Amino acid sequence: MAAENSSNAINVDTSLDSDSKPNRDANDMTDHDSSSKALVIPAPAVCLVRFAGDAASGAFMGSVFGYGSGLFKKKGFKGSFVDAGQSAKTFAVLSGVHSLVVCLLKQIRGKDDAINVGVAGCCTGLALSFPGAPQAMLQSCLTFGAFSFILEGLNKRQTALAHSVSFRQQTRSPQHDLPLLSLAIPIHDEIKGAFSSFCNSLTKPKKLKFPHAR
């Protein structure tokens, strides 16, 4: 009896272990999915790194643009450095602040849509016109925010249209293709014979006999 009880206990334990394994696997899968989804949302450190990188690239592009603009205005090689510095500052603020605000809003809201881009544009306008009057700052905020929002909406719409067109082309069956129309017109046999005799008469003209003088 004791042996039977011990064997039954072993069977129960093994069945419980086998039943708990799928649950543990399911929990591991859910934990993995949640961790992968959490990795999609950028962390504040990642936002700061993006801010630094975008600001540096914007400053470089702005300096090149400003220096070229100074040379175009014939300010000389030394005088163009002033324009290069101002343009580098403007482009660095544009790229850095916009990237930082978009990244932070994506982390807070958990979405990546045109609202984030519009708010980032507003913050960029405020940063550009910060040492100014409140009316000018508000106008710059509204201008940059509206422009960024509209541009992002147009980009999303174009990508959606491109995906829909490609999906339609892939799913379209060859049965819906229209058959090619034949433009050949049947010609009667009598017309063919008359046309062939006319062509022969053109290729082999008859020799006319003129009367000779005696």
UniProtKB/Swiss-Prot annotation:
Topology of the protein relative to the lipid bilayer: Multi-pass membrane protein
Key words of the record: Membrane, Mitochondrion, Mitochondrion inner membrane, Transmembrane, Transmembrane helix
Basic and acidic residues bias (residue ranges): 18-35
Location (main, coarse): mitochondrion
An annotated GO BP: protein transport
Organ and tissue specificity: Expressed in young cotyledons, roots, flowers and leaves.
InterPro entries recorded: TIM22
Polar residues compositional bias, start-end: 1-17
Recorded GO CC terms: chloroplast; chloroplast envelope; TIM22 mitochondrial import inner membrane insertion complex
Subcellular localization: Mitochondrion inner membrane
Function description: Essential core component of the TIM22 complex, a complex that mediates the import and insertion of multi-pass transmembrane proteins into the mitochondrial inner membrane.
PANTHER family attached to this UniProt entry: CHLOROPLASTIC IMPORT INNER MEMBRANE TRANSLOCASE SUBUNIT TIM22-2-RELATED (PTHR14110:SF1), MITOCHONDRIAL IMPORT INNER MEMBRANE TRANSLOCASE SUBUNIT TIM22 (PTHR14110)
Protein name: Mitochondrial import inner membrane translocase subunit TIM22-3
Species, as recorded: Arabidopsis thaliana (Mouse-ear cress)
High-level lineage: Eukaryota, Viridiplantae, Streptophyta, Embryophyta, Tracheophyta
